[in-house]
Curated annotation (Swiss-Prot):
It comes from Homo sapiens (Human). The keyword Magnesium applies. Expression is primarily restricted to central and peripheral nervous system. Greatly increased expression in most cancerous tissues. This is Tubulin beta-3 chain. The gene is TUBB3. Heterodimer of alpha- and beta-tubulin. A typical microtubule is a hollow water-filled tube with an outer diameter of 25 nm and an inner diameter of 15 nM. Alpha-beta heterodimers associate head-to-tail to form protofilaments running lengthwise along the microtubule wall with the beta-tubulin subunit facing the microtubule plus end conferring a structural polarity. Microtubules usually have 13 protofilaments but different protofilament numbers can be found in some organisms and specialized cells.
Amino acid sequence: MREIVHIQAGQCGNQIGAKFWEVISDEHGIDPSGNYVGDSDLQLERISVYYNEASSHKYVPRAILVDLEPGTMDSVRSGAFGHLFRPDNFIFGQSGAGNNWAKGHYTEGAELVDSVLDVVRKECENCDCLQGFQLTHSLGGGTGSGMGTLLISKVREEYPDRIMNTFSVVPSPKVSDTVVEPYNATLSIHQLVENTDETYCIDNEALYDICFRTLKLATPTYGDLNHLVSATMSGVTTSLRFPGQLNADLRKLAVNMVPFPRLHFFMPGFAPLTARGSQQYRALTVPELTQQMFDAKNMMAACDPRHGRYLTVATVFRGRMSMKEVDEQMLAIQSKNSSYFVEWIPNNVKVAVCDIPPRGLKMSSTFIGNSTAIQELFKRISEQFTAMFRRKAFLHWYTGEGMDEMEFTEAESNMNDLVSEYQQYQDATAEEEGEMYEDDEEESEAQGPK
């Protein structure tokens, strides 16, 4: 089977990673000690994608837990599903990265990275036919962002032909831990643009807004935000974990979703949005699910898709429902909103249906969009970055770990290039496409969008 090796790095990465394993273990009928207690063959048919079956018929996640300080991993280990993980796969330092990207990427993280790679190798040798890696991390801290991106480039070196997929939590001033988040995020995005195949942008700003506006939670906690993240991660991995035809592995998803190699930052969405521990009273209809999942309020990235255009979209519907109705609704949305889909990629919306709904819902839908509106998120970070960088505020923490200012300038311009590329394809029309390629590449970039 086609296995995926999961890596979680840093405090945020370990918390959303642990939550992800709780949710999918529940969906596959795996109890906290790794025994199968489910009731459907569908749960086991592709279980080997994420789990390794040990000799005692126990299922062990193909997960590697990494952090530069022991705190978060101790709480994962003592949490509900702590005994599920392989004890050797907990790798941690003692020093911490102090929210400093340079410590995670160049100094502290670099010392720990080889012992992580040993475990990665061991997990990959356990695989029959590895399809790729997924990393959960945040971009605002030190370990997840700095060491996370270091791991990506090291793993990439060793497994160049395997897919690299990340769930990256993007920082926001609304839910901020540190003042240097824009630095860490910009340096990380500089790496992600070059070294990953698929990145789901999970945006703390959007999660906070959903909790506050839609779920009416007065003071959202990280637990509430992580509940949304785990619902989304469970949704976007559905077609990898359950039998089906569409986007059944990471590479097929990448082929459908990524028209240009640098533009691989996806906007996830989920419907229906429910608060933690609440029961849903009424099953939604397919039209309602479709309506909601294309709604800006349901996006996990704080960007308004109406400000851009979709290059590609993949959706997953879960639960017992009529395929015909799903197809009709999806076509209806596309024909009503055709101006929001680029016309030079025909059939750019793909739909998968899985019979098994998530816990507590009769039906749900998950949305993965590659929209040019994601540039709003990069612009937001870029503005915060520039405000500090032009005064060289806080730079000594980074140069003190051996970094050069030049690296900051490069990261800044790479992110600005990314924004212009999204803008260029947002403005492109089918007629102009031909001319665009005839021009010299540099020339068209110098002119910006036509």
